[in-house]
């Protein structure tokens, strides 16, 4: 499928339409009401863009948890109301404190490992909605009793559908500006070094644009 980018959009904006569409898909599939609290577990590119999509849908309070302080700083810039460094504090305790002890109305898990998958089940309120968008480990072990006895709704989200068109329009209209995630612009020849630095953990840049 091919989508035409409007002439008013540059390639930097265009490069972030796909991950924004993925984030918008997850939010569209997640049930919460206006003025409710949404928790996002994982502040990678998709998790960060989920902040923008959740706010656009009407989330009143957005809580973001991650172990990377740089990503959490970016989450705050994007509008997260509460950020939690999970390597320094217990996310569940803070989420409960921020929601009057009930838990978030909805939780979007954007990591995809056993620890955070289970964390998402404990972070949501009774009868709440959990969406998994993280896709790191093929097999995870979860606490099934949390789903059954607390009547949780759990679903997965993958890719996008009509959200790609929605993402284009949101960026074109200025409703969402995802380009804040672009932290460096470099030449294509610098690509191998930058990729190696990211893979090794030497760099924690979120998005880099490589120009010919």
Regions found by a protein language model. Name each.
Residues 9-88, 93:
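Mid-domain Rossmann-like dinucleotide-binding core that forms the NAD(H)/NADP(H) cofactor-binding site
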Residues 1-2:
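Glycine-rich phosphate/adenylate-binding loop and adjacent beta-alpha elements
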Residues 39, 63, 129-131, 155, ...:
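Structural detector of well-ordered beta-strand residues that form the stable sheet scaffold
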Residues 118-122, 161, 165-212:
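C-terminal hydrophobic helical "lid"/dimerization subdomain
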Residues 30-32, 73, 78-153:
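Glycine-rich cofactor phosphate-binding loops and adjacent beta1-alpha1 units
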């Amino acid at each position: 499928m091919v989508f035409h980018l409007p002439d008013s959009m540059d390639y930097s904006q265009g490069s972030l339409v796909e991950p924004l569409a993925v984030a918008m898909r997850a939010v569209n599939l997640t049930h919460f009401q206006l003025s409710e609290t949404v928790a996002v577990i994982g502040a990678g590119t998709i998790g960060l863009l989920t902040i923008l999509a959740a706010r656009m849908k009407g989330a009143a309070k957005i809580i973001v948890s991650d172990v990377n302080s740089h990503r959490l700083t970016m989450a705050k810039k994007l509008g997260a109301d509460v950020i939690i460094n999970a390597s320094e504090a217990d996310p569940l305790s803070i989420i409960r404190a921020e929601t009057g002890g009930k838990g978030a109305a909805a939780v979007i898990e954007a990591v995809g490992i056993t620890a955070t998958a289970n964390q998402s089940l404990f972070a949501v309120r009774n009868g709440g909605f959990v969406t998994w968008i993280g896709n790191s480990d093929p097999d995870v072990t979860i606490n099934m009793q949390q789903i059954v006895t607390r009547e949780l709704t759990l679903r997965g989200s993958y890719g996008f559908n009509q959200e790609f068109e929605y993402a284009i329009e949101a960026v074109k209209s200025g409703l969402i500006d995802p380009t804040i995630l672009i932290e460096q612009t470099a030449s294509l020849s610098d690509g191998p070094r930058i990729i190696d630095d990211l893979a090794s953990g030497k760099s924690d840049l979120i998005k880099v644009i490589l120009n010919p």
